[in-house]
């Protein structure tokens, strides 16, 4: 049975991208009004109401034992085909193709960094949470830190947080909230979604990827940070050093989706070799 994960707002609505720049890219940005935008707003309204310190803490416990399924990376890639992504309503091809498209875009630009190619294949695997009953607002969309006041570049910031109980709690409603200045993003509780799930899963299964890969996975949907320039008060020097890597990955995530489909079967042996190198065998999900 296919599960409708809906449009990923991170790919549909980007108010902080220069429209002229967007016009030179693929037509993924041709969603700016009408019912789709209404659905995106509703998704963010639900997300910004329910993503709290308590909610995120409970989700980390719920998924933290990684006892939902045992499977390989390639089996998880295949599961993406059970997700219906309405952000591409006119392009009827399996979601797994986007994983290979992203990976191949990175491979062409960075042929000497095989670990980076693998990140392209892996980056959306956390969306399988939708197959386990998670609502869209807890799977996709832009992420942000909980436990402190949302900053200006968070999408729909001024119109979607009114019902979030954390903002009525003095511990969580200031710019720093429950954090210390420059505490480092590794010490920050991020909103729950496919980024955070996969990051935690990779740590649990001891992927032998470099730290740049973990940053790309955990923060590729953290647009208020890597594109909006916010939340610098929480960053350590390491975070700032890693920021260009996340920004580099983001280019391929957004702009490699197109109807020219890769020959997945011919690519599979190469990527299986990378999996065997960095995250082999049956893993805990």
Curated annotation (Swiss-Prot):
Annotated cofactor note: Binds 2 iron ions per subunit.
Pfam families, sorted: MIOX
Residues at which Fe cation 1 binds: 98, 123-124, 253
Gene Ontology CC entries for this record: cytoplasm; inclusion body
Predominant cellular place of this UniProt entry's protein: cytoplasm
Keyword terms: Cytoplasm, Iron, Metal-binding, Oxidoreductase, Phosphoprotein
EC number: 1.13.99.1
A Gene Ontology molecular function term of the record: aldo-keto reductase (NADPH) activity
A Gene Ontology BP annotation from the UniProt entry: inositol catabolic process
Binding locations of substrate: 29, 85-88, 127, 141-142, 220-221
Cofactor: Fe cation
Phosphoserine, modified sites: 33
Top EC class, one word: oxidoreductase
Cellular compartments annotated: Cytoplasm
Positions of Fe cation 2 binding: 124, 194, 220
Biological pathway: Polyol metabolism; myo-inositol degradation into D-glucuronate; D-glucuronate from myo-inositol: step 1/1
Tissue expression pattern: Kidney specific. Renal proximal tubules.
Reaction catalyzed: myo-inositol + O2 = D-glucuronate + H2O + H(+)
Similarity comment: family membership: Belongs to the myo-inositol oxygenase family.
Stated name of the protein: Inositol oxygenase
Organism of origin: Mus musculus (Mouse)
Gene that encodes the chain: Miox
């Amino acid at each position: 049975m296919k599960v409708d994960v809906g449009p990923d707002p991170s790919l549909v609505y980007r108010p902080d991208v220069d429209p002229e720049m967007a016009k030179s890219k693929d037509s993924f940005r041709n969603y700016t009004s009408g019912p789709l935008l209404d659905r995106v707003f509703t998704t963010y309204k639900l997300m910004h109401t329910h993503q709290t310190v308590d909610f995120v803490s409970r989700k980390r416990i719920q998924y933290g034992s990684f006892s939902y399924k045992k499977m390989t990376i390639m089996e998880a890639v295949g599961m993406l085909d059970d997700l219906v992504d309405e952000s591409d309503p006119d392009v009827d091809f399996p979601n797994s193709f986007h994983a290979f498209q992203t990976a191949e875009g990175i491979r062409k630009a960075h042929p000497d960094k095989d670990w980076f190619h693998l990140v392209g294949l892996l980056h959306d695997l956390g969306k399988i949470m939708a197959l386990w009953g998670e609502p869209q607002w807890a799977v996709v969309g832009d992420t942000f830190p909980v436990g402190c006041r949302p900053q200006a570049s968070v999408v729909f910031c001024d119109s979607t947080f009114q019902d979030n109980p954390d903002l009525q709690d003095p511990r969580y409603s200031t710019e720093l909230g429950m954090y210390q200045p420059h505490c480092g993003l590794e010490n920050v509780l991020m909103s729950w979604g496919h980024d955070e799930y996969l990051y935690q899963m990779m740590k649990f299964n001891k992927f032998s990827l470099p730290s740049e890969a973990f940053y790309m996975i955990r923060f590729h949907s953290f647009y208020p940070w890597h594109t909006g320039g916010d939340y610098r008060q929480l960053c350590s020097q390491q975070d700032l050093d890693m920021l260009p890597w996340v920004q580099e990955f983001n280019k391929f995530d957004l702009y490699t989706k197109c109807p020219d489909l890769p020959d997945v079967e011919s690519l599979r042996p190469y990527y299986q070799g990378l999996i065997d190198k960095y995250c082999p065998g049956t893993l805990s999900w």
